[in-house]
């Protein structure tokens, strides 16, 4: 299951981590975001996945240039390594961390 995080948790769990993780930038009102949810939950069985609500954490979304959602960003060592925008498949999500 994907863990919903806030701004403080983002700084410690994502930016402060040496591990690869995925962050799903979403909003509750976004239909494609809701459709991506089960895909991200499936990915979370094998990889670290966090969800960040862009309505609650506008500054972080702006900091990472999130203009459209859903937006999934892969991080490693606290830095962005890849991203995907829009409703995509599990295999497309996995490619973000395999490249």
Language-model-detected regions and their locations in the chain:
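Short pre-active-site segment immediately N-terminal to redox-active cysteine/selenocysteine motifs
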Residues: 19, 25-29, 68
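Non-catalytic, surface beta->alpha helical segment in thiol-disulfide oxidoreductase systems
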Residues: 76-99
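A short beta-strand-turn-helix
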Residues: 3-20
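Structural alpha/beta surface segment adjacent to cysteine/selenocysteine redox centers
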Residues: 60-69, 73-75, 79-81
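Short glycine/proline-enriched coil/turn segments at helix->beta-strand junctions
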Residues: 18-19, 44-48, 98-99
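Thiol-based oxidoreductase modules, predominantly thioredoxin-like and allied folds used
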Residues: 4-6, 25, 37-60, 66
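The canonical Cys-X-X-Cys-His
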Residues: 30-33, 72
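Short loop/turn elements that flank and shape the SAM/SAH-binding pocket of Class I
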Residues: 11-13, 57-59, 91
